[in-house]
């Protein structure tokens, strides 16, 4: 019997080298997971509509429409919460939070990933995830997590 392979939308900021490195680590782990279709991991940074001038209205419209369409086509959203971790800031990126909310509203499971272990978690995020992988060691478990069963995995983070 073959195992279903899930399509993933990867929600994450990708504006700095540190952010892009975290994305690559998470993608690498997901590609090792037997319940993930490694060819169906949608990474928004790879779909930026270069045919339109960056920041223009047409570019904004195309990127927003594409990202929202892909969130709703995904079986699961994996969200990297770290935004400005290198600067010691622990608030998630607003775009990532929007994508989490969109997925949750559409009943698409959200798997949260956070490299910064000591941060606190906003109540709205704390109630919207299916599983939470906290810290570099725990994040390694993404490669073995069963995205078909989607077992609830809680975090001990303080909730605000």
What are these language model-derived features?
Residues 1-160:
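Conserved catalytic or regulatory cores that recognize and/or transform ribose-phosphate-containing ligands
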